[in-house]
Swiss-Prot record:
The family this protein is said to belong to: Belongs to the complex I 49 kDa subunit family.
Gene for this chain: nuoD
Protein name stated in the entry: NADH-quinone oxidoreductase subunit D
Organism classification: Bacteria, Bacillati, Bacillota, Clostridia, Eubacteriales
Membrane-protein topology: Peripheral membrane protein
HAMAP family listed in its UniProt record: NDH1_NuoD
Subcellular location: Cell membrane
Description of how the protein assembles with itself and partners: NDH-1 is composed of 14 different subunits. Subunits NuoB, C, D, E, F, and G constitute the peripheral sector of the complex.
Naturally occurring in which organism (per UniProt): Desulfitobacterium hafniense (strain Y51)
Amino acid sequence: MSDLYNEGTEELLLNMGPQHPSMHGVFRMVVRLQGETVTGIEPKIGYLHRGLEKIAESRTYPQFIPYTDRLDYLASPHNNLAYVQTVEKLMGLEIPERAEYLRIILAELARFASHQVFIASAALDMAGWTAWGYPFRDRERILDLFEMMSGSRLTVNCMRIGGVSAEPPAEFWPALESFLDDMPEKLEEYFNIYMGNEIAQARMKKVGILSKEVAENLCITGPALRASGVQYDVRKAEPYGIYDRFDFEVPVLYGCDTYDRNLIRFMEMNESLKIIRQAVRDIPEGPIMAKVPKIIKPPAGEVYHRVENPKGELGFYIVSNGTPKPERVKIRAGAFVNLQCLNEIGVGTYIQDLIASFASLDAVLGEVDK
């Protein structure tokens, strides 16, 4: 009987995406299956490629800022920040204190909102409809704050070379204080509904293992790296802006599984709230823009700068030839690099567990495809 069974089994090729709702964008996986067990994964990317690096060569330095919003569009202030700080580093610009604090507030709000989308979508991938609704409900409050600040809710475009785009209106600060007061209780609510669920735990614990050694060898960054036992965060390792003034911890977990890659984001959200509170307390009065020339022409040279994006390390490499337009722009996208570990976390698991494991990487295809 066993011989008959073995003769009747064959490898199945399954296409997942690019329209699959669990692909978090136009991403496609060619999955090899033996029964329900995954034996191989071939990622297929590029469906959202827009040639941003090439576009940058035909735009002036300020003109390219809105394009960066379209990288990780769930955390656009981080993309803005990485780019403008790279140009400022090339120019040797000193940024006003108030602008530095506003940048931190916007960036950490974006990190919080990005993780809210992660929690909601990861829960929905396992049919957790209730856990999906709560984070999206509260994320609206952050989008309201972005709208007050910039007029836009998603592609915020709030950073400028030399500072920020606008002074927050008077109603921004009470709304922010109310948000900070309410969120600890809301986070506990998300945790109990999602991470406390026995079915979710059974589908995530000891599944999708990404060991410390493999994570380091593949240059994985962000929450996926910290959930594999590596306490590394650019904000601490190489502080940019004024992050060195803030008291916060870099969460680290050692389970190396899908569960820990979810849990680490809850821990990071608490740290983001802590940073925002300190920024609101300490923000000084003063200008929000440095004195910059109307036509920005950084000196000829090259520069690389990186920030801690919610998805991983985001870096910009810019080559300047002394004209108003860059000669070359290279973007190091954390979500793109992190996809390298897909076979590591997926092969050997069941097809239904692959969905949760892939979701735990929190890949956004705008950043992957550029």
